[in-house]
Regions:
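Acyltransferase/transacylase module recognition
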Residues: 1, 140-232
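Helix-rich "cap/lid" substructures immediately adjacent to catalytic or cofactor-binding pockets
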Residues: 1-7, 88
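Conserved alpha/beta-hydrolase "nucleophile elbow" surrounding the catalytic nucleophile
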Residues: 8-9, 80
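Glycine-rich nucleophile elbow surrounding the catalytic serine of serine-hydrolase chemistry
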Residues: 9-18, 22-23
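Glycine-rich beta-strand-to-loop/alpha-helix junction loops that act as flexible
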Residues: 11, 91, 195-197
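Alpha/beta catalytic cores of group-transfer enzymes, especially the acyltransferase/condensing modules
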Residues: 20-171
Length: 232
């Protein structure tokens, strides 16, 4: 298939980089295992969590969170997934206070506390970020053979940028929605193929651009069906 570009959300970014030959499969597996270990250490050190915010009034929520931070509340936007969903993280107390304010001010259709043990992609994971900085210096990276757009910068990965961006990714927001827009604009795509369990990313992609033909492969049967359809 003529693949024009790839995106992976959070951990999935490593899958995209492996598929693009920016790093080997063996090195990639070791690297994500170490990444998980570093993140678990931060998660154990201080309790934090995430909440999804559906149909957000983004500018108003950004202003609210800035005000909360100025009031010494530890709450941050963690993921900009699509025009219809962002994810906010923080300590449980501060996060609940922020969600309550969002609901009182009608700044979103709905908020949902997520069952996770960390406010990923926020400063709560600065410790893991520092450990990844050191670990990434040992990795033999290569120029991606297929273009991969970074969650962090919304620009194409290049070999020399990989260590710095992957380190930073742990503690700053992801921008999947903007990544999809960039892929449509830069690579002129009209079809996306999500590989993995569930169809969450396909849903985000469709929310970004309703003209996209979103396809999904979850298992071998899906793969064989997809390949047959392409041949036909």
């Amino acid at each position: 298939l003529p693949i024009k570009g790839m995106i992976g959300l959070s951990l999935g970014e490593y899958v995209a980089l492996i598929a693009s030959n920016a790093l080997s499969f063996e090195e990639g597996i070791k690297l994500v295992a170490d990444r998980a270990h570093f993140m678990q250490q931060d998660a154990d050190r201080e309790i934090s969590t995430l909440a999804a915010v559906l149909d957000p009034q983004l500018q108003e929520i950004q202003e609210l969170i800035t005000a909360q931070q100025e009031n010494n509340q530890r709450v941050y936007i963690a993921n900009y997934n699509s025009p219809q969903q962002i994810v906010v993280g923080g300590t449980l107390t501060d996060l609940k206070a922020t969600l309550k304010k969002i609901e009182e001010d009608n700044l979103a259709k709905r908020t949902i506390l997520l069952k996770v043990n960390g406010a990923f992609h926020t400063p709560f994971f600065n410790g893991a970020r520092q450990q990844m900085h050191n670990r990434l210096q040992t990795v033999d990276f290569h120029e991606p053979q297929i273009e991969v757009i970074s969650n962090t910068t919304n620009s194409l990965f290049h070999c020399e940028d990989l260590p710095g961006i992957l380190e930073k990714q742990l503690a700053v927001p992801t921008h999947f929605g903007a990544n999809v827009k960039e892929l449509v604009k830069h690579a002129k795509i009209d079809t996306t193929l999500e590989i993995g369990p569930g169809k969450t990313l396909s849903r985000f992609a469709h929310q970004v651009d309703q003209q996209l033909n979103t396809q999904h492969i979850e298992n071998l049967a899906d793969y064989e069906k997809f390949i047959k359809e392409q041949k036909d």
